[in-house]
Amino acid sequence: MTREELKKLPKIELHCHLDGSLSRRFLEARLGRTVLDEELSVTQECRSLAEYLEKFDLPGVCLKDEEGLEGAGYDVLHTMSQEHVCYAEIRFAPLLSVTESMNTERVIAALLRGLERGKKEFNIEYNVITCAMRHHSAEQNYQMLKTARQFLGTGVCAADLAGAEAQYPMSEFMELFQKTKDLGMPFTIHAGECGDPQNIMDAVRVGAGRIGHGIAMHGQPEIQRMVREAHVGVEMCPISNLQTKAVSGSSEYPLREFLDSGLCVTVNTDNRTVSNTSMTKELEFIQKTYGICDDEILLLMRNAAECAFAKEDVKNRLKMLMR
């Protein structure tokens, strides 16, 4: 497909962080000043994940009140509408926005108001994934997830675990996600983004419906088989992973390997603004770099419809679009 055809293609995105995907327009309006390119996005010269994460300081400041959260929800759907995204799951960590005057419930409700406004204006279906953070205590994370559970089916669709994977392995969170499962809340887990493939196995064993990144399965056919047989979706984010040096170079990135292994692979942006990317750019990149053909691009979209944390009627509509 040409770039224009890719842009017009109805697209599904399942792994998109709110704070890493806010537009320059939104950030400048909130901050009341011009924002420089180097404050917004990394370049190809990005040396590490630590350097990549520095870009999140600015958007974090803008998500500390209800007006900011509501505006952010609207803003991210506006951005997505410009490239024909028809369904998106937006993830964020509510506890990073909690203040003395704004509790978790108000944080989530504010974001949902903005997303609902965006849905009506731009005709994009959405859901929210609430992220537990690895550096927060088990009690903090569980209380947040209990609050998020109140919104399940009315804007929130699932939970996630994000943060420093190497420092806080999945084994430390098995009890938390067993409790999450007991709450009746589906979840995805950032696992195998860097380092230990054991985190992927633990995520699957505790009941994750999807895993974020999963690149530590590279060259691990037994783990790939485990993921495939458990029908666990794999949320891949090629451009972001190359920028953070999660792999040493594009030839080491296992997208083709995972597709050929029969995994339910999806392609996503991760952080639209920080990575200076879009779904169109991601698809164009994998076409050129990995020889992904048109039928495989449609397969990636059908996979996304299949493993979305959406209601069945929404999933069925998405599948019809991706035929």
Residue ranges and their predicted role:
Residues M1-M185, C194-N199, R205, G209-R210, ...:
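Metal-cofactor-binding active-site regions of metalloenzymes
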